[in-house]
Each structure stands twice: as C-alpha cells, then as structure tokens.
Curated annotation (Swiss-Prot):
Organism whose genome encodes this protein: Crucihimalaya wallichii
Entry-annotated residues carrying Phosphoserine: 208
Protein name: Ribulose bisphosphate carboxylase large chain
A GO CC term attached to the entry: chloroplast
Modification after translation, per record: The disulfide bond which can form in the large chain dimeric partners within the hexadecamer appears to be associated with oxidative stress and protein turnover.
Amino acid sequence: MSPQTETKASVGFKAGVKEYKLTYYTPEYETKDTDILAAFRVTPQPGVPPEEAGAAVAAESSTGTWTTVWTDGLTSLDRYKGRCYHIEPVPGEETQFIAYVAYPLDLFEEGSVTNMFTSIVGNVFGFKALAALRLEDLRIPPAYTKTFQGPPHGIQVERDKLNKYGRPLLGCTIKPKLGLSAKNYGRAVYECLRGGLDFTKDDENVNSQPFMRWRDRFLFCAEAIYKSQAETGEIKGHYLNATAGTCEEMIKRAVFARELGVPIVMHDYLTGGFTANTSLAHYCRDNGLLLHIHRAMHAVIDRQKNHGMHFRVLAKALRLSGGDHIHAGTVVGKLEGDRESTLGFVDLLRDDYVEKDRSRGIFFTQDWVSLPGVLPVASGGIHVWHMPALTEIFGDDSVLQFGGGTLGHPWGNAPGAVANRVALEACVQARNEGRDLAVEGNEIIREACKWSPELAAACEVWKEIRFNFPTIDKLDGQE
C-alpha cells in the first residue's frame, strides 16, 4: 500500500457520493448564541425530499461538496459545517418549505458582508436539486455584529448635525434624472431647498456622464446648498452620488465633497458592491459625512417570492456595511412594497432590538447591540395626498423623498417644495394634536390648502393619481 493510500485510509476515507441529509440534516441541534441563523424558502425538484433539500443548502453554503473528499478527515466538520436544524411547510404552498440553517461563526471573516454573502447566497442558488431558493431572513449574532462599524453616524447624530427634530425629513430627487447640464441641475437644487425641503438628491444613475461631469455637478450643487441655507436659516443638503467605476474614483469624489463642506454623499450599494460600500462608509465616519444609500438593482434580487433574497436581508446587510439612509419603498406609491413586510424591515433598520414576528415577516429576534440605526427613505410616485399616510406609516425617523411630486408642481420647483413642506407640517401638527392621520388625512390636507395656495394647486394636479396594482411579494397567508 502506498503512503498516500495509507494516509487516506487512516482518516477513514471512503470514496463515493452520499446523501447530504446524513451529515447536514441535524434536527436535534440546539442553536448557539454565536451562530448565524438563516431561513431559506426551499422549492425542491420533484422527487427530492425536503430534508435532503434543506441539508443540501446547508452543505453547499458551508463545507460540503458533491462527493466525499479525503481532506474532510483533515479538519473537524462537526465544528465548521452548516446544519439544517428545522424544516416547516409554507402555508398554502405544497412544494415549498422553510429550511432553517445554522452556521458557525468561524466560517465568516470579521466585518465582511462580502464574505458572509459569498457563502450564504453563493453557488447554492444554482444547485440543480432545487427548483428555486430564497433567503427570507438572517439572524446576525451580537458576536458578529460587533465586528462591523455599521452606519457612519446614525439617526440621532444626523438629527444633531442638521438641527432638525420632531418630524420626518423631506427630500426631492432632481428630474429629469439624466440630461440636465450642471448649472440647470444646480438651479433646480436651489429652488427645491429654498422652498422648504431638507435635502435634494442625485438620481441613482447620475454618476459622471458627458452631459454633466461629476465635478461640475458637485460645485453647482454646493453653491445651491450654501445659497439656500443663507436665505432660509436652515441646514440643507444634497445627496451627491459618489458611485463610480472604481473604488479609488469613488473615494476621490467623496474627498471632493468633503472639501466643499457639504453634509452628505450617496452610494448605489448593490451595483457598487458591499466592499466599496463599506469602504465609503468608513471614510464618511472618519470625515463627518452622512451617507445616503440607494438600492438600485434590489428588485432583480428580491421581488420574486420563491427565488432570490428578501429585502429585509439586504437591509440588515446594509446596516452592517454602513449607510445613514436607505430607500425602503413607500407602501402607497408606484413601487413594490407590502405594508406589514415593509414595516418589519423598517424596524430592523431603525430599532436596537426587534422581536421575532412572523406576521411581519421577521423570522428571528435581532439584537443590534447599539449599532447605529438607518433612516428609511420613502420614495417613488408619492405626492402631497400621500403625506398623511406616509407620516402615519413611517413616523418621524424617516425621509419622505419626492421627485415628480415636487418638480411637477404647475407653478414650478420652489412652490412644489412649499406644498410638500406645508403638507408635512400640517400632518405633524394634526398628529401631535391627537388626530388620526389614517382616518382624517384628506381632511387635514384640505384644511391646510386654505392657507397655502401652493398646496391647493398641488392637490388639484394630483387628486386623481393612483397606483392600484397588487403587491407581488406578499407575506405568506395574504394571497
């Protein structure tokens, strides 16, 4: 017998293929406080038992491969393997199951969302034994959370920087999103900020195109910020999109924003990538910049109910990677968003401790151990008639981000901003007086129209606008 054969035999190696469930399905396993827990929606191929499918997910996202290998004997699989510890059927779905998987913490590099996702949502999503696979939720243990910096500043620090309390913040995305010159773009920024908004915003696909190079845009927007601040006495900001083709270029743009003295920059965190996002978040914390996050590309990943990844997971990942704002849907606007599910991940963004609540899609209790919170941004097809609902749904710690709902005002950009601000102030005052925004919202807006012609004009323009389409990604049991 050759020395190599003797080595393989001595570690108990037996070539061949064995069922995943013999090693990776462990219903007797008691999860540890340090485990990362995952809830997967599994749709096995016909003939594949759910236990085998769940075990395959645990194996292929941790230590397993398609066949037995002799190097298994050179490490402790019991220490490092993922374990499918529970499987439950999905109500109303005969072919779908929720498989719960526990991962030992040592499988993941500290402070790296990139590494965590490479394992948990990597090659396993193309596994042939599965017709579809979706990651519904993750439990991030405090031991892992503490290896991340998280948001550069967080909700309270942002309010202190801006000196704005007791109400949602107001924003506006400059439109048209592409094609304006830098000077005309800066003019629109100035008019919106002067009219009463707290922020204006680059659209997600505004980077540095031939019609408007980034440096010109930054300069004209900075001028607009300082001019509007001088005229209103309020602190203003514009989300300057630093997203670029390389991390080095992205940081260069953030450095220039800091040199201009503006308060906030922006990043497209999914198209830019988690490594770039975490690097930018670290820079922003070290240099006093707030960081606005856009979620462009999220619907490619999260919209289909049986495959991909739910946005609550992307939201948790962003809180770890770092961002002070993130777009979170509106419930009432033009973009996808179920109310209970949206409120669930809004709490996961803002709160320090969130209890398990399956009625809102929260599969695990999440303790953030004082990691700073993230402001959810409601954006997409909203206007003044939505203000009572938005104020009631999202509360004070949020950003209500208009676009066409400001710039589409018949009298111009500044009157559009005035209408937004008046509607918000009316809703906040009514709420503070004990009125029910959900019931009396339209009446509150009509009353405010009596002393704001700008709001009255906006209400007339958008009184018939509706986006009455069913939500595709509903919580189980809501069909």
